[in-house]
């Protein structure tokens, strides 16, 4: 057995590394002495849990003062000891539990269903204490960031960076590849590994007293993490043939437009300076500037030049737009899907159900939240399972209905109760002397204001997004405030709360909410936006909890803000989508937040116009 000693917050801690099967008896003694609760972590060959060559190398268990590192890579005896420990201990604390629990299931055949009920996740707890990221003036939620603030800054700066240091010291090794290449008993590697469960055990001691929310919220946030881990495990079937053809088509398109741009003297369409030089040589005057003072050539300018420029300028601007788009789509999305799919041709997204200041969910791997809205080409890459159809169920004006429910504005509530056109109602309030229909431009301006109010936007935002002058923009904003006076009153109450406390508290409804959202007193107007965004997230989150309880989780693929995507058996697709919609619907106070179920064909893209 190898022993490493280190200091954490003034205390000596010991890390014991199992070397031989004889050492496992000492590990078992340690487990028997701590059956109540332990820190837990794993070290693996990388982050690609579902790739064929993925392995778990070590599993670590620890108290605030002692850790044991078991090298499961050495074979069945070591794996068996860890499996027995995972089953025997009654409670564990991990940081980002979803990853490690998927590792244990994938490599040690320990079902997540048996592990989640006895897990506490310090990443979830840290978010409930302070939901802001480091870039927002908060503490952050990574293990390194939380340890730096709550436990020991020196350990965070020196120990949690050890693997990056190891990679830097080795020729041809990167931070991504060091995990599979480092020697199993490298002392630096063992120190890094053994420290994690010790830090998790210490972190929960610091965080637990600081979490000022209901226990039910803590439990349900863990349940949400559990549900999302099951969706990650399930994966989303990739149409490999279509995706490979799309990759080739995009490559040809990118090459063609690069050639067109080159004929105008632009070697790199991703170089703003080169594009700007060519445009100016054609007589285009570039007025916009970036914060650093460089010429600004963005999509708005290029799109305008395509429509209004001379034939040559239009052709060049189109080549830049289309060439960059083809390159981005291929490299960022299509080729990534092909590269990261598992042996069953399934892509496994990473779903974080508790993200951002407002707790909005985020998805990486399959970037459903950032794909071009309304476009089917990329979405066509993904399929429902064999014998299934794709179903999408989204909420009807989720954020506006949440705004109506929380403000209890009589006119807005009645508009939803009577199924009126809210945007038309706002437009007519802004221009009472005009004859306005659903096709009038005023309705479009009013729609911008309705959603802009949710996001904290005023007349300036409306003017920028609609092209109205400030006087007209102010007119439509004033029309909104006259039509729905309680919204303005709610916003003012929230601003006072934010200035007084430094935060607002969201409403606690059916097990979720009641969280504190920090608000910068200088930007107190953002409080309404935070409230609506966070409360809307909780609507979708409560839907996931109900769907899970009803047994629908195996059919769910992705939660996308106000939409849930599912693969449902073709023979029962209409019923399945309708039932999912019924379970998602929520009566929030006086307002029903209803849903629109839709069944497509085999591909996700079919919901956006694709034939298959």
Predicted regions and their residues:
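Conserved "right-hand" nucleotidyltransferase catalytic core of DNA-directed polymerases
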Residues: 1-25, 32, 37, 42-44, ...
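Active-site-proximal helix-loop-helix substrate-binding element of RNase H-like nuclease domains
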Residues: 2-19, 48, 52-208, 296, ...
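Short alpha-helical scaffolding segments that buttress acidic/His motifs in well-ordered protein cores
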Residues: 123, 147, 189, 224-231, ...
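Conserved catalytic core of nucleic-acid polymerases
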Residues: 284-286, 307-310, 348, 353-356, ...
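Short hydrophobic/aromatic beta-strand micro-patches
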Residues: 465, 565-569
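Helix N-cap motif at beta-to-alpha junctions
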Residues: 470, 569-574
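Short amphipathic alpha-helices in soluble, non-transmembrane regions
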Residues: 576-584
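Conserved short beta-strand edge segments in small beta-sheet-based binding/regulatory domains
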Residues: 587-599
